[in-house]
């Protein structure tokens, strides 16, 4: 096999810079340069809850799925989505599964860093998603999964890798399986049309830093093209406006926006501190930038929001049974060969 030009994280070694802890592998290779400390873990959990509320607690964007084997790419340090899938897949009475099984599905959660500790039913895999999946024939084997979940990887995957990455995800699915993707465009928008001095400045620094590391900060707008090129069918897209601040007329979105204001400020810190400071910004200037962003977030007349791009598509059927209910209800073929059992201990 030819040598693999992309690096893989070999340890969870960290570096302490600017008052925060970062994964050494991340900052050395320009991949998701955000902290890995408790403050960041709490932010990720809160942000996950906001996104879950925005999508009305839908774990699966294609409706009526009952996946047995799930791959979660960009699972986050706390693997919140994977854990929620497992919590909701606990076997109920009348299940035909073995008495030794605790869950109706298995989830492999992939990221470059995971916290210590085990999560029942979830296999944690350390993997740089810039590496072609052919270099792993176990958890990333072809034709293995019913559902692949990929989210918030714009600052992790090289711009030149995205087409091949989506193709890799396509090839990990069984016929009839689904891929769902979610990306955010952290260029804050204002329904008022007024200019955003500080938020736009933050975005310019952040996006230029990502582009300098061969990342595409606007990749959410390209996902449908990548999926079509990879051969997906039944492609659907659900763009969202994530409100920031308590301005929306809809009570549910108004509440989400109220809670998102605090999380958005934390997100600007987490996503921005490494890149801003590395660009030569002094601590006092960074704090002034964040304070200016906070003032703009507090102005409800601006009606701020973050664009989100949710998209999903299906790998073409290959002789498997499927119930057509809006083209999205997938039933696994009971005769198919299952992968080796996963040790959940």
Task: Name each model-derived stretch.
Residues 1-143, 161, 183-211, 215, ...:
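N-terminal charged/capping segments associated with class I S-adenosyl-L-methionine
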Residues 149:
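A conserved beta-strand element that flanks and buttresses the S-adenosyl-L-methionine
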Residues 152-155:
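Short catalytic micro-motifs in class I SAM-dependent methyltransferases
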Residues 163-178:
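A short glycine-rich, Lys/Arg-flanked "PGG" loop and its adjoining helix->strand segment in the class I
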Residues 179-180, 234:
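A short hydrophobic/small-residue beta-strand
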Residues 215-230:
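Short alpha-helix
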Residues 233-241:
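Short, well-structured beta-strand/strand-turn elements
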């Amino acid at each position: 096999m030819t040598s693999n030009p992309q690096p893989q994280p070999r340890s969870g070694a960290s570096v302490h810079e600017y008052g925060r802890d970062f994964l050494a592998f991340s900052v050395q290779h320009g991949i998701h340069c955000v902290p890995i400390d408790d403050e960041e873990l709490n932010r990720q959990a809160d942000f996950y809850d906001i996104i879950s509320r925005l999508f009305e607690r839908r774990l699966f964007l294609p409706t009526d799925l009952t996946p047995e084997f799930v791959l979660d790419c960009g699972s986050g340090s706390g693997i919140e989505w994977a854990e929620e899938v497992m919590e909701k897949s606990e076997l109920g009475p009348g299940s035909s599964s073995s008495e030794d099984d605790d869950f109706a599905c298995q989830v492999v959660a992939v990221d470059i860093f995971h916290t210590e500790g085990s999560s029942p039913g979830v296999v944690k895999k350390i993997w740089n998603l810039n590496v072609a999946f052919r270099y792993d024939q176990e958890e990333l084997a072809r034709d293995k999964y019913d559902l692949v979940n990929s989210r918030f990887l714009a600052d992790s995957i090289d711009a030149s890798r995205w087409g091949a990455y989506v193709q890799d995800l396509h090839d990990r699915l069984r016929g009839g399986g689904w891929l769902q993707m979610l990306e955010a465009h952290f260029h804050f928008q204002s329904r008022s049309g007024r200019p955003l001095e500080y938020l736009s400045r933050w975005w310019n620094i952040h996006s230029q830093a990502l582009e300098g590391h061969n990342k595409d900060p606007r990749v959410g707008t390209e996902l449908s093209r990548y999926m079509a090129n990879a051969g997906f069918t039944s492609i659907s897209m659900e763009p969202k406006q994530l409100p920031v601040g308590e301005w929306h007329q809809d009570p549910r979105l108004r509440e989400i926006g109220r809670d998102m204001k605090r999380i958005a400020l934390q997100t600007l810190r987490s996503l921005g501190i490494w890149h801003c400071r590395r660009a030569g910004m002094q601590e006092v200037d960074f704090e002034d930038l964040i304070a200016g962003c906070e003032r703009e977030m507090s102005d409800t007349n601006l009606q701020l929001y973050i664009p989100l791009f949710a998209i999903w598509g299906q790998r073409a059927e290959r002789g498997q049974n499927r119930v057509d209910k809006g083209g999205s209800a997938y039933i696994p073929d009971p005769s198919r060969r299952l992968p080796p059992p996963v040790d959940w201990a």
